[in-house]
Amino acid sequence: MKILKAGCFLINKQDKTVALVYRKQFDDYSFPKGHLEKSETLEDCAIRETAEETKRIAKIVKEFEPYINNYVTLTGKECSCYMYLAIDNGASDNKSKDTHPTYWIPFEQVEDKLTYQNLKDVWNSVKDKILSLIN
């Protein structure tokens, strides 16, 4: 059975920055994302996971289709991760304990900050859309 995940490219338009989370247990920088829960839409999952991991409210930009990253996990399971472009809409009151330190990275530095090549490839596939959104 395919694993479904969703997350956000969370953008601060005023500062032209992108939120990355630092996951201490993996010593990596990533976009906020996570597993789809039962009876949850992919958009709802992206918003919830972003709120849990960053304590920020994500407002999905409906004009852009999600980027779908298909891959196989280290344990051999197929996974599809739907990544939505979203604008930061302020602090969230989410009470999750799954929060990670969140860093607002200047647009030009995101690729260098990401830990894994597959995430750098994802970023390079969407950065022009994000640039059009923040300019």
Q: Which residue ranges define each predicted feature?
A:
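Unchanged
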Residues: 36-61, 67-122
